[in-house]
Amino acid sequence: MKPSTAFMAIADYLEGEKSSPIRHEYLGGQIFAMSGGSEDHNRIALNIASWLKFHLRGSGCKTFIADMKVNISIAQRTADLFYYPDVMVTCDPQDTEKFYKRYPCLIVEVLSPSTESLDRREKWLNYQTLPSLQEYILVSQSAMKVEIYRLDAGGNWSLEILEADDLLVLNSVGLTLTIAEIYDEILLP
C-alpha cells in the first residue's frame, strides 16, 4: 500500500470511496491504496463467505466480502481507521451504515505476500479494539493452514493453528468447516 501525503477528513474519504476505481484504507486521516488479490486469494475468500452466507441465512447476521469496510474508532489516539477485510460477519442490529460496519463478530484475512505483515501486526492490534469481535482468522494461500484467534470469556485471546485434516470451528456464528472446504478448487504446491 502506498500512502497519500495529504490529510483527509472521514466524510471526504467515504464520499471518494463511492466512486474510486481503487480501494483505499484510511488510517487516521491518511489513505493507502490497496493492491488487487490473486485468483487463489479471491477464491479462498469466496469459499469462506459462501459457507457463511448459506449458514447464516435468516439469522439476522450479515456476511460481507472484500468491498465492505470496517470502521474502528480508537479513542486514546483520537483516530478513526477503515479497513477492507476479505470476509466479515456482523450480527449486531446497530450495524446499519451502508458503506461500513462497526460491530463485526468475525473477520477473515487471506494472507498475501504484500500484506501478510500488515494483517498480522497492525490490523490485528487494531481489530482487537473492536468490542464485538470474537474471532479473527488468517488464511494462507501457499499451504492448507488457517490461524484462528479467539476471544474467551475472560477477555483473553488464544491462537489455534489448523492444517489440512483439521476442522475450523467458528464459535461466533456456530459454523464448522473442514479445511478442505476452505481450499476447495485451490491447487497448492
What name fits each language-model region?
Residues 1-189:
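Gly/Pro/Ser/Thr-rich low-complexity, intrinsically disordered segments predominantly at protein N-termini
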